[in-house]
Design a protein with these regions (language model features):
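Bacterial N-terminal signal peptides that target proteins for export
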Residues: 2-14
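Accessory terminal helices/loops
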Residues: 23-29, 33-41, 130, 256-266, ...
Length: 347
């Protein structure tokens, strides 16, 4: 039976993977135990519950509930973590990672500069161990005897996190120690290639996808957020057209399970927040944003003011699913971000 687009990975998460309590994350359980009743566990380090989900057992896992979603890849070389969660959740995240694998954390890959993704950088890095003895904690007085895990990110992440950047979202010891400004950075760890793909001017100017090629898992960061309309952070270089371009790239990377439709096959996409996704979920999200963008563009072209654009309700038909009347990112804020992004392009 073919599932409706937008619900495929919701079902997959309930049938193909295992969500287990932090105290019992074991490879055999991850492979055999169904996730029909997801188990959440609280811990003394955080009042929030964490969920550990086996995305591609026995190699790729996801930790939810620590701020942004966290991906964990394990193997003989050690542990690779994509995003580190919030500062407050770091002790609980470390405990979860240790129960997934006793190997040291080797790399932390930041998908962007937001505090709920990079806040745990310092704690996770200091708990890890690099392949390169010369790598030391950042900051004015690093411990010269202590090696740490490498923090890899696009160059803009370090700028936004530092005091000299446009926003300060982390301590000096949590700053990236390995940055790049080109389109693609790659690693080969735990038996598979890992591509880190820069997506300029999307959610911010320093977003990346982390693509685990053999596992066929893409970590999308906040370019894809299934909870609401995407956050277009224009102050940090984000734009609506860059967001759509990044989603087009993500749709190209995420191969659907065709012609044989299977809930167990196809590329899995880990969003910045929310449930696991697949190719069709990305397409649905991209199409929704494109339609709203085109509606706003027509209004901008006709000379409408921001208030007139908001009154025209260009997100109608989608606000019920992705909208928010209050909170951190409202429908009005999204429409305003799209308007301001397009107004910059207007001749």
């Amino acid at each position: 039976m073919t599932l409706a687009p937008g619900r495929r990975l919701g079902r997959l998460a309930l049938s193909a993977a295992a969500c287990v309590a932090l105290g019992v994350v074991q490879r055999d359980i991850a492979l055999e135990r169904p996730i029909d009743a997801a188990v959440q566990t609280s811990n003394s380090a955080s009042s929030d519950a964490l969920e550990v989900l086996a995305v591609r057992p026995p190699n790729v896992f996801m930790i939810a509930g620590a701020g942004g979603n966290i991906a964990v890849q394990i193997g003989e070389d050690g542990v690779v973590v994509v995003d580190a969660g919030s500062t407050a959740s770091a002790p609980a995240v470390l405990a979860a990672i240790k129960r997934i694998s006793p190997k040291p954390i080797r790399y932390i890959i930041d998908t962007g500069p937001d505090a709920d993704h990079v806040g745990g950088n310092e704690a996770l890095s200091k708990a890890g161990d690099t392949f390169f003895p010369g790598t030391r904690p950042a900051g004015p007085r690093p411990d010269p005897t202590r090696a740490v895990a490498t923090i890899l990110a696009a160059e803009g992440v370090a700028l936004h996190m530092s005091a000299s950047g446009s926003a300060s979202t982390g301590s000096p010891a949590g700053l990236p120690t390995d940055t790049f400004h080109y389109a693609r950075k790659y690693l080969y760890l735990n038996g598979e290639p890992i591509e880190v793909l820069h997506q300029p001017a999307a959610h911010t100017d320093s977003d990346v996808f982390a693509f685990f090629r053999r596992s066929d898992v893409v970590v999308a960061g906040d370019i894809l957020d299934t909870r609401h309309f995407p956050v277009i952070d224009s102050e940090r270089g984000g734009s609506i057209d860059g967001e759509i371009a990044a989603l087009n790239r993500l749709a190209e990377l995420a191969v659907p399970s065709v012609p044989i439709v299977s809930r167990e096959a196809g590329t899995i996409v880990i969003p910045g927040h929310g449930r696991l996704c697949d190719h069709f979920d990305v397409i649905e999200y991209r199409d929704m944003i494109t339609i709203v963008r085109d509606r706003v563009r027509d209004l901008v072209t006709s000379g409408r003011s921001l208030e007139q654009v908001k009154a025209a309700a260009p997100a109608a038909g989608y606000a019920g699913r992705y909208g928010n009347a209050g909170g951190d990112w409202t429908t009005d804020q999204f429409v305003e971000a799209v308007y301001r992004s397009l107004a910059k392009e207007k001749p």
